[in-house]
Amino acid sequence: MTPHDEEVDSSD
């Protein structure tokens, strides 16, 4: 999915 505006990887 498209990562949000935070410390998120390409996992979600």
Curated annotation (Swiss-Prot):
Superkingdom of origin organism: Eukaryota
Protein name: Putative uncharacterized protein DDB_G0294150
